[in-house]
């Protein structure tokens, strides 16, 4: 599963403080290619035609709908650059509390209103979503927008846009997609929330650029507005005199803000605000209604299915030039850990040794460190990996470290989430013996410890090793030194009936579990997370897990791209692996100065699949698991590994039926 390649390179970045509308996202190379194959052109947005006296369309004088197509697409759609326009429609979503639901807004120019290789620049604004009772889903907090950027020509990277007003460049003859997500807080009141998205074609000249605030100015404006909010927000129960004083102070601050130069053009000589420009701006914009129904179901904070995903510590060390164990190293791991928790997955960091032995750990600090409990007790973790320190060294110090960690953790309520991952895909009896030996060490300190072992075949030097029967009999080689038997979905192929053969060999009464994983396989048309697969194919990985009855899931790597020693270097997938295999997010530095990772569309679809499991679990708890399976098939969402929906509608039907029967 793991290998390290080598690559050096870099991608052009905008200088700090430059408006993102003035540059185009650079190409990100995969196995090969790049350059103009990704629509890259090293140009800005200034129009040279204006200087030459050539007639240029003024987008402020005509409706934006005459300049560009706008339509919405579901989150399972792969909206490529050659995606053709669909009819305009409004957005209507259904979401539970503590759920993220996403949709795409596609933009394609009808003609060009700029020059220098661009079709034009578009501004996107979104209002808060409000309910009739006055509750809000706040734009910039619960609502976010990201630009879908192609990787190897396939839409995948989700690059955050500047908020509250985003600007993007459109290229002639190409479709661009914006990924809009709604994160519903766990405490959000149920109801129908309404808002709108305004999409407006802009002038691409120096005058427009001058109206954009610098980052420092934006921060000052943000600070002033936040101060006003803090003055008036906590007025409940306050004496009337204090409320009046707070309002007076806030009014004074707001009047001061309106005197900023950036607002001067909206004022007449008498100081009253001239709304004509605003009305004209709104009238030429494309107005897309954005509605979300929040229903009275809250996704559990702790995922029902433990889904453990690996993060290579060596990739982080190489790309960000971090010394193992340094302050920067701990900061980087901490940042990755916290960021990945939002996707309902339980991360573990890993370092690979010879013959596929692995050091896997969720917390980079020892169990007696003050920070460790913050990791292990996080309710968003469904499972955590405990490091087996002797895998790196058989020294007394390593054994003492293991003993100390286990003795501390086994006394905690969260110990039931703990597991040890020692070896990836053992291939022969010698490797099986090493697993048994390491497990014995661990069980000396904690007889109830759980050992996880992944495998796709029986030991090669055992009798009949090449047969499915040898694969099924693996538990007899590893019992009682493995409790979580994690098998490859590739072995099953399209034979769901083989699940019964696997589970029949297990002893759940003795704490044995069956988990699954995907890696290089299975391949198309079965569900996996390779780049270029259909969106429903990505989402169906978790449908398959739920239908087959696995109690957990493992994915070998989320950041295992080729080695580089430069943070902003272009991304290349590892040779020998299907594109996208082992890569679910990208370094933020590739796209901007930000250090925050960039999610892939595939990672968002993993989240959607994890959320679907919670919906199906709710339905099954009301009507039985058999009825849950019947719903999955009746709606046409998922029938088998090669028979699942290619369209999004059955997903909406399934979710709507669960909403209707369990919460409406």
Map each language-model feature to its residues.
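Surface-exposed binding patches on compact interaction domains or structured appendages
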Residues: 17-88, 110-179
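Contiguous beta-strand segments within globular domains
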Residues: 88-111
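Short, surface-exposed loop/turn segments at beta-strand-coil junctions that are enriched for proline
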Residues: 183-190
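A short beta-strand micro-motif common to beta-rich folds, especially ectodomain repeats
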Residues: 191-202
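An acidic-aromatic substrate-binding cleft motif
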Residues: 277-390, 410-413
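Catalytic domains of carbohydrate-active enzymes that cleave complex glycans
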Residues: 374, 387-394, 398-431, 435, ...
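Active-site clefts of carbohydrate-active enzymes
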Residues: 509-535
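Substrate-binding cleft of secreted/luminal carbohydrate-active enzymes
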Residues: 533-579
